[in-house]
Amino acid sequence: MAKIIGIDLGTTNSCVAVMENNKPKVIENAEGTRTTPSIVAYAEDNEVLVGASAKRQAVTNPENTLFAIKRLIGRKFDEEVVQKDISVTPYKIVRADNNDAWIEVRGRKIAPPEVSAQVLMKMKKTAEDYLGESVTEAVITVPAYFNDSQRQATKDAGRIAGLEVKRIINEPTAAALAFGMDKKEGDRKIAVYDLGGGTFDISIIEIAEIEGEHQFEVLATNGDTFLGGEDFDSSVISYLVEEFRKESGIDLKKDMLALQRLKDAAEKAKIELSSSQQTEVNLPYITADASGPKHLAVKITRAKLESLVEELIERTAGPCRTALKDAGLSVSDIDDVILVGGQTRMPKVQDKVKEIFGKEPRKDVNPDEAVAIGAAIQGGVLQGDVKDVLLLDVTPLSLGIETLGGVMTKLIQKNTTIPTKAQQIFSTAEDSQTAVTIHVLQGEREMASGNKSLGQFNLTDIPPAQRGMPQIEVTFDIDANGILHVSAKDKATGKENKIKIQASSGLSEDEIQKMVKDAETHAEEDKKALELVNSRNQCDAMIHSVKKSLTEYGDKLEADEKSKIEAALKDAEEALKSGDKEAIDAKTQVLTEASHKLAEKMYAQEQAQAGQQAGPGAGSASAGQSGEKPVEGEVVDAEFEEVKDKK
């Protein structure tokens, strides 16, 4: 039976794990590392690079190297957080036809789930290489505070990658599974503080033994889906840019290549300062002006870094206190605090966690791998390999509909255990009203306009009646993935309409199917693209060689021979523009055959010159000064071989 793998699809890095002999195992990728950068690069000639290879070329290809795409998934272009990202990312974030935030790469608009699918495909391949068998099913994690649209978009990404997503689970819950599976210490309440590359979550979870069953119940969750290590990096980048501007008067903000180098340097400096008190950012030739090249050299102390990101760290305190309040607990009720996400390695973050919860956070959980391990355990539960484990998760935000006066009426409160179902009766607002619009919302604000719109649909053909008379039953049903299904039914006629909330990724079923097919044919396309590149390179090399030789030896050819070669050259150049591999190969062959006569003339001339050489020393020197040496230089290997054979 094929394994269900667990994937932590992270903002900065991703990780994959699987259950093996009843134990979760993190799988190393082809590069030998246990985590993979969540970076996708679109090179020329349609080549797609994922992970470390994409990260390595980012400095030279910033506009087409996509990172932190998870921050855009399921978001609208006009959202404030998206607009903020536009000002700091080297790649182009654009408005899609349905007002979603998409990315434009090499003239093509790409949906965030399609980019995330590339990372998931890399994770899938990593697992397949290790297991030696095909993988088609996965448990994928998302931030606990992801809304319905973001969850649906993540599920779409899985489908595009060729994976059936058996379950979407929250990252802190997955980390709790990883922490608590082997703990037999009785009932305990834990706080999972998850500060990753792009998102922050806090979950209060109760781990209990109930009739021999290991139960993980989420009591409350909170967070910020636009707060993470990327923001810490941005603070360091802004500081470096400002320091350089003060010193040189040059603003690096509009220099994409410089910004990409700064991003790499800022991330390295931030990591170094977790274990040392001072580091130096050294970037030679960062830019240049009329006076020459400029170099950036800035010392950063740990204290300086902490002052730069103090506000970001403080932003995590509010959600922690809210989660405790929602769970009906005080700080003293928490037995353990677990740190998840690479950014929690920063000493100042650990100090803040200790300050909030009044106790030292535990260090026995790997912050980079815990989430993937938990996802693999959940995969084992779904497969039946892991027994006696019950996971009770919650919906992070309240769900409801817009009612008269633009008010949001909540049907399901935040932190309700899922799966769950809720029903409520509504009526019409006007006399003789024959249709109602059900506008589905998610959020905590009282007014509809302050909440996230998840979608809307109409219930029509309601028999005319006085306002308030018809009875419209609205049902909200949240599945185990936290994805919402809504229906509305006229109780008088039995007429019903329903909607499965589509992600604001805006991907219709047809678009998803198209992307699935694109992904399936991607390997074949890669092969064809590589063959085309090779053919182009061969043709280009032949054109260059023939042109050069024609310039030097063309006068020794008959007129018809020369015109034949020139015609073949022109045809080959035209074929290069077409991108048709067969045409390029054919014209390369024609050019090769047409240039045979030219090669004969070249060979004859070289033989004549070789015969005129007086001696190896003097001959070489005089030839070098005669102006004829460059001709020999072009065929230097063959020419010297010839001479040695003769002597």
From Swiss-Prot:
Residue ranges, compositional bias (Low complexity): 604-627
Primary gene name: dnaK
List of residues that carry Phosphothreonine: 199
Function: Acts as a chaperone.
Keyword Cell membrane appears in the UniProt entry: no
Similarity comment: Belongs to the heat shock protein 70 family.
Annotated InterPro entries: ATPase_NBD, Chaperone_DnaK, Heat_shock_70_CS, HSP70_C_sf, HSP70_peptide-bd_sf, Hsp_70_fam
Official protein name in the record: Chaperone protein DnaK
GO MF, one annotated term: ATP-dependent protein folding chaperone
Matching HAMAP family: DnaK
NCBIfam families registered for this protein in UniProt: PRK00290.1, PRK05183.1, prok_dnaK
The entry's keywords: ATP-binding, Chaperone, Nucleotide-binding, Phosphoprotein, Stress response
Gene3D superfamilies the record matches: 1.20.1270.10, 3.30.420.40, Actin, Chain A, domain 4, Substrate Binding Domain Of DNAk, Chain A, domain 1
Native source species: Nitrosomonas eutropha (strain DSM 101675 / C91 / Nm57)
Transmembrane regions listed in the UniProt entry: none
Induction pattern: By stress conditions e.g. heat shock.
Pfam family, one: HSP70
Sequence segments annotated as region (Disordered): 602-647
